[in-house]
């Protein structure tokens, strides 16, 4: 409250103004309302320095007063025993549009007048009761509200606030579109607009399209979009709890079903339904089929577990819950003439073929041969699709009978496996597999065949020329040898004999693996170390020429030893070592080849043999070549090098002395020859000098007589040249005159030709002009005659002569002739004659 200020004792209070006056005697404050002139008493004090305006609330507005005064039922103020208005301290009062009113002492305006809130259509205010009160509605009905209650004030309308009610928030209606539903949840137990009792946490859908204003006990969960169903798409649903669906069918918790376009075009899942997945339609053509596992029983609507159903095209369907396709959609088995199907019975069933019936037991195998179409029934499993195998003469396959286990090979013609047969894969050792991929030749640069081998085909091997292959039959316990060139085909119980030969220099065991044994002739090289009688260690590099001697009665003898190269090198090496050990280094160094050949080949009757023959496998060594001999010991090698160097120096010095003597001898011979040549040259020089003197004398004589002859000859030649030049000049002048005359003639000819053509053109123009003039005159005359008419001409003819002349002159005729009709004139021929005469005269002028 403002501090009172003492002013004038007379205060003029205007209309709609007021002042607070304090009575100091009673300490009571009263209100004085204008218009009036207030005279303050001595015991009174005005609390306001100036009169205050009354509170004015415009229409459709309100304000809030704190600590309002108390009025009785008649609207009068209630005062206490001190004659002071009673206040509701701590309370508030909302006052609406009314006459201006003053504020009594203790009243406070919390909020200035504000407009009332207008609630639009599809809108509402969420209200909350702060304390208990009874609301009287417009229809005189009363509603009791308890503190904590919430309700909606729905539009359209104007909301008049109350101090007992709190506006929580504005609420707007939610628009539900077509093919859409609003999902709601109950915040507490209540009865909705459809008089349905809703429990706390219960959810439901509002499917009607349009505006929906959620209630105060309803919570919006979200929107549910409708599922669009087509002839190609369906949806699988799951019941989360037992309920009755929108089609009136009772669904139990956990039950699954599908909804298709036959049920409805669009479907909004209920709150008790869960969309598991969308299902696409399965379409079968007339060339397709499928097997459905656990099909739905149409009577009970449940899956027949463990059962299967065969479906064939043309048809379109959806898989029901619990159903599945075995191996998906399958095409009809179309068999050509060279194809067949191997079938197996999974259970016992009876197959009807025409009038006959065949009982198949579980595990039975049989085949269906083409050409035909075949759809296997449920009891039949297609084991494999077989095709007739084309085989050439040099091709084959291994076939095993699954009943007896016997394996055989089929060659030379196309073959279709029987129901109890299968292709057998022949196992081979890895080394044999690797050798089969390699070429049979010994060319190291030749490419290998890296493609994988079909182990069910008969194994073939091309034996190269001059080679042999041994094949062992384990069932018959015998071997056969094939000589090349030949193609080997292995039977099921046969295996190749793999040769493991020593290779490289020096020889290493098992370095060369091969299926074919080359018969030679060929050579091999080895490096061995020997020791002489005087303990000199030497390294020998030997080459052997060898070949096999084949015995036709016993060809397996060739493969008696698995490593003939190692055996050969060991045998010859031991012989060479023994022979070298009995010889000194100097002797062996001089006669190494003879010693080695004698040691290896031996001798008979005092003469050395020419070969070494191995009885075990028929190997023959025909020659030994010593390629190099090198000492192994460094000291021996150094002494050998020194001796060689000394021998080289001695030989070099002797050659130098011989060359020096020969050079001196040649030098002496060259000097003698040079002196002799000098003498001969001097004699020839004197002879040439005498000839020169004679020639000089002759030239002096000729010089004296030849000058006069030369001058006379020159003058004669000059005269001849001058005469010839004059003749040539005369000829050229004549030729020039002739050329000028010819050119002038040509110019005249060209000029005359041009003039003649010009005159002809003028004459032609004159002729054309004359012809056209004659034509014009003739036409003009005909037009005159036609214009005059026959009657007019007749009148002119009958007129006097003078009159005729005037009339004809008036027609523009310069000359005319009038005759009778009995003697006509041909004027056209006359004109032609005149024109012809003119043409003849022009030609004559030309």
From Swiss-Prot:
UniProt keyword Ribonucleoprotein present: yes
Any one of the GO CC terms: phagocytic vesicle
Superkingdom, natural source: Eukaryota
Pfam families cross-referenced by the UniProt entry: MVP_shoulder (PF11978), Vault (PF01505), Vault_2 (PF17794), Vault_3 (PF17795), Vault_4 (PF17796)
Region forming the signal peptide: none
Keywords for the protein's UniProt record, in alphabetical order: Acetylation, Cytoplasm, Nucleus, Repeat, Ribonucleoprotein
MVP repeats: 2-60, 61-115, 116-172, 173-225, 226-280, 281-332, 333-388, 389-458, 459-521
Localization in the cell: Cytoplasm; Nucleus
Keyword Nucleus in annotation: yes
Broad class of where this protein is predominantly found: cytoplasm
InterPro entries per UniProt: Band_7/SPFH_dom_sf (IPR036013), MVP (IPR039059), MVP_rep_dom (IPR041139), MVP_rep_sf (IPR043023), MVP_shoulder (IPR021870), Vault_2 (IPR041134), Vault_2_sf (IPR043179), Vault_3 (IPR040989)
N-acetylalanine: residues carrying this PTM: 2
Subunit description: The vault ribonucleoprotein particle is a huge (400 A x 670 A) cage structure of 12.9 MDa. It consists of a dimer of half-vaults, with each half-vault comprising 39 identical major vault protein (MVP) chains. Dictyostelium is one of the few organisms in which the major component is actually two proteins (alpha and beta).
Role description: Unknown, though MVP-beta is required for normal vault structure.
Protein name as annotated: Major vault protein beta
Species name: Dictyostelium discoideum
Gene: mvpB
């Amino acid at each position: 409250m403002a501090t009172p200020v003492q002013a004038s004792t007379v205060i003029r209070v205007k209309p709609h103004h007021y002042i607070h006056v304090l009575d100091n005697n009673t300490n009571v404050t009263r209100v004085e309302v204008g218009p009036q002139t207030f005279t303050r008493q001595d015991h009174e004090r005005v609390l306001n320095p100036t009169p205050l305006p009354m509170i004015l609330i415009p229409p459709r507005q309100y304000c809030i007063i704190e600590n309002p005064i108390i009025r009785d039922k008649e609207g009068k103020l209630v005062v206490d025993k001190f004659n002071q208005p009673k206040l509701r301290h701590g309370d508030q009062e909302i006052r609406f549009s009314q006459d201006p009113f003053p504020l009594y002492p203790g009243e406070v305006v919390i909020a200035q007048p504000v407009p009332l809130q207008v609630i639009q259509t599809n809108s509402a205010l969420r209200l909350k009761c702060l304390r208990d009160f009874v609301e009287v509605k417009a229809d005189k009905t009363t509603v009791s509200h308890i503190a904590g209650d919430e309700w909606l004030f729905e539009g359209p309308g104007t909301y008049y606030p109350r101090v007992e009610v709190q506006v929580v928030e504005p609420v707007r209606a939610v628009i539900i579109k077509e093919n859409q539903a609003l999902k709601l949840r109950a915040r507490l137990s209540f009865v909705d607009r459809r008089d349905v009792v809703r429990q706390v946490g219960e959810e439901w859908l509002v499917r009607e399209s349009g505006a929906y204003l959620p209630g105060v006990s309803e919570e919006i969960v979200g929107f549910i979009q409708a599922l669009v169903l087509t002839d190609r798409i369906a949806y699988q649903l799951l019941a989360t709890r037992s309920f009755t669906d929108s089609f009136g069918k009772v669904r139990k918790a956990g039950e699954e079903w599908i909804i298709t376009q036959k049920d409805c075009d669009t479907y909004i899942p209920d709150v008790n339904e869960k969309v598991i997945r969308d299902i696409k339609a399965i379409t079968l053509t007339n060339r397709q089929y499928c097997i459905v596992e656990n099909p739905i029983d149409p009577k009970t609507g449940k899956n027949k577990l463990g059962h299967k159903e065969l479906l064939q095209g043309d048809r379109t369907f959806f898989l029901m819950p619990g159903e599945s396709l075995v191996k998906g959609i399958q095409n009809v088995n179309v068999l050509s003439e060279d194809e067949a199907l191997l079938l197996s019975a999974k259970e016992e069933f009876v197959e009807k073929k025409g009038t006959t019936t065949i009982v198949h037991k579980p595990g039975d195998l049989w085949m269906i041969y083409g050409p035909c179409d075949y759809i296997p029934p449920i009891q039949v499993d297609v084991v494999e699709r077989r095709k007739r195998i084309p085989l050439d003469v040099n091709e084959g396959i291994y076939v095993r009978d699954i009943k007896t286990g016997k394996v055989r090979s089929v060659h030379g013609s196309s073959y279709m496996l029987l129901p109890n047969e299968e292709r057998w894969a022949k196992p081979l050792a890895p080394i044999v597999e690797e050798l089969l991929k390699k070429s049979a030749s010994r060319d190291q640069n030749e490419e290998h065949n890296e493609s994988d081998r079909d182990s069910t085909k008969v194994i073939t091997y091309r034996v190269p020329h001059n080679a042999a292959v041994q094949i062992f039959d384990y069932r018959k316990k015998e071997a056969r040898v094939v000589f090349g060139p030949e193609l080997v085909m292995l039977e099921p119980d046969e295996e190749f004999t793999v040769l493991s030969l020593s290779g490289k220099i020096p020889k290493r065991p098992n370095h060369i693996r091969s299926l074919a044994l080359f018969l030679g002739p060929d050579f091999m090289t080895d490096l061995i170390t020997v020791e002489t009688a005087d303990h000199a260690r030497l390294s020998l590099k030997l080459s052997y020429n060898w070949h096999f001697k084949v015995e036709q009665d016993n060809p397996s003898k060739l493969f008696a030893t698995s490593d003939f190269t190692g055996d050969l090198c060991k045998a010859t090496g031991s012989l060479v070592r023994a022979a070298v050990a009995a010889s000194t280094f100097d002797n062996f160094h001089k006669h190494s080849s003879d010693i080695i050949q004698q040691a290896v080949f031996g001798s008979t009757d005092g003469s050395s043999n020419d070969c070494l023959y191995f009885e075990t496998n028929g190997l023959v060594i025909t020659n030994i070549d010593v390629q190099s001999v090198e000492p192994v010991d460094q000291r021996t090698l150094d002494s050998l090098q020194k001796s060689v160097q000394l021998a080289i120096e001695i030989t070099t010095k002797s050659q130098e002395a011989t060359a020096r003597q020969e050079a001196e001898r040649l030098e002496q011979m060259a000097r003698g020859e040079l002196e002799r040549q000098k003498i001969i040259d001097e004699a020839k020089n004197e002879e040439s000098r005498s000839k020169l003197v004679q020639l000089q004398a002759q030239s002096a004589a000729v010089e004296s007589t030849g000058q006069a002859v030369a001058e006379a000859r020159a003058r004669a030649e000059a005269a001849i040249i001058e005469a010839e030049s004059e003749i040539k000049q005369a000829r050229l002048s004549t030729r020039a005159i002739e050329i000028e005359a010819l050119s002038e003639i040509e110019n005249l000819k060209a000029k005359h030709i041009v003039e003649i053509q010009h005159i002809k053109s003028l004459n032609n123009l004159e002729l054309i002009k004359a012809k056209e003039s004659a034509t014009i005159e003739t036409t003009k005359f005909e037009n005159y005659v036609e214009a005059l008419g026959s009657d007019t001409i007749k009148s002119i003819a009958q007129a006097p002569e003078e009159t005729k002349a005037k009339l004809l002159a008036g027609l523009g005729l310069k000359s005319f002739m009038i005759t009778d009709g009995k003697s006509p004139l041909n004027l056209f021929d006359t004109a032609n004659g005149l024109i012809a005469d003119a043409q003849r005269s022009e030609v004559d002028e030309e």
